[in-house]
UniProtKB/Swiss-Prot annotation:
Gene3D superfamilies reported for this sequence: 2.40.50.40
Chain segments annotated as transmembrane: none
Descriptive protein name: C-C motif chemokine 21
GO cellular component, one term: extracellular space
Organism this protein belongs to: Macaca mulatta
Gene: CCL21
Amino acid sequence: MAQSLALSLLILVLAFGIPGTQGSDGGAQDCCLKYSQRKIPAKVVRSYRKQEPSLGCSIPAILFLPRKRSQAELCADPKELWVQQLMQHLDKTPTPRKPVQGCRKDRGVPKNGKKGKGCKRTEQSQTPKGP
């Protein structure tokens, strides 16, 4: 009796404790089931991610993330030339950074005598403190 109880507990521990038995990442994963039939314009896309069949999805795909976060991801066939070109374009395009208000060329120099938050912090970090 004790052996069968111990064996049952061992089976339960193994069944629930081994990664991969509940899915590739331990939870639900969004997968593309089919590809978009139309070309996706670069101006509506901010980035992309790859979907691999080895990660639990049925087809390989590129999921393009739209600029508007409220819109759904767009699925495309990674073998298509336009998809590869769009991926290369996104890889080359740097993420836009907002300039610091009130500073010139991020040097910590205030514009027209105005002190901005970024300028003050930059000046403090560049000014050596000592006797």
